[in-house]
Amino acid sequence: VAMEVALESNGFFIGIEYLATFCCGMVGGLAAVRKGYDIFAILVTTWLTALGGGIIRDVLLGALPPAGVSDKGLVITALLAAVAVAIIYPEVDKLKWSMLSLDALALGLYAVNGTSKAMMYHMSGTTAVFLGMFTALGGGLIRDMLINEVPMVIRDKHWYAVPSAVGCVLTVLVCKGVNEGIVSFPAEVVLDVLIVVLVVAMRLISVFFDIQLPGALARHNTYLPSEAKYLKRPVIHPDRNDDDIKRK
């Protein structure tokens, strides 16, 4: 109970949570509108996109019932985002960079929000980082499953999870500094804002300059001899012809 009171009395923490909820809800609602869903489906998709990551975090923290279902303010904020998207959809859909910026902003805000809440519940730094990433990425994962698409964190080759992880790690360091009396509350607010700015900048720069994470190493010239000669029946490989199988 004392922990919940501490969270609810932190105006900056509450502001981050509400702003992240609205931004993330706008992105989720737009995805549902593009799929041609009805208003109820838009509301559900927006709500789960905005608060799904936080629900996962709260369940893992044991903070029950989760804020995503118990906090009327957060639920209303998510639903307002859905209504806003449904009304101004044609205009919003044309603003590619604006929506990308909103998504990046939600990513940074939720990274700070989720990690800070985990640290307030006296989780270890590693656990707080994972819970922060669950908060930042969980809603998007749920959104993409609802609209039957490969999750953005998987299909987007630009930096997406990486900025979130960086933001979570930096937030842990700030929280540890606060706990040890090294960082004051005003300094914590400034540092949290800078962390959000860094996450947003990393995300947008990676998209603008097409910076991608490397994949598997190409090994086109490597030949592995077939082991079909040791089998009673030959195995036909889809990328080899019969001469490859007979080769010793």
Regions found by a protein language model. Give the residues of each.
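Structural signature of hydrophobic alpha-helical transmembrane segments
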Residues: 9-21, 66-80, 124-137
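The first (N-terminal) embedded transmembrane alpha-helix
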Residues: 14-27, 45-48, 167-170
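C-terminal ends of transmembrane helices
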Residues: 25-35, 58, 83-96, 141-152, ...
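Cytoplasmic-side transmembrane-helix entry/capping segments in multi-pass membrane proteins
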Residues: 40-48, 70-76, 96-107, 131, ...
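Short, structured motif recognition centered on aromatic/hydrophobic residues
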Residues: 44-48, 55-61, 130, 134, ...
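Hydrophobic alpha-helical transmembrane segments in multi-pass integral membrane proteins
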Residues: 58, 112-123, 166-181
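Ordered, amphipathic secondary-structure segments that act as subunit-interaction surfaces
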Residues: 80-117
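Short, highly charged, low-complexity non-transmembrane loops/tails of multi-pass membrane proteins
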Residues: 214-244
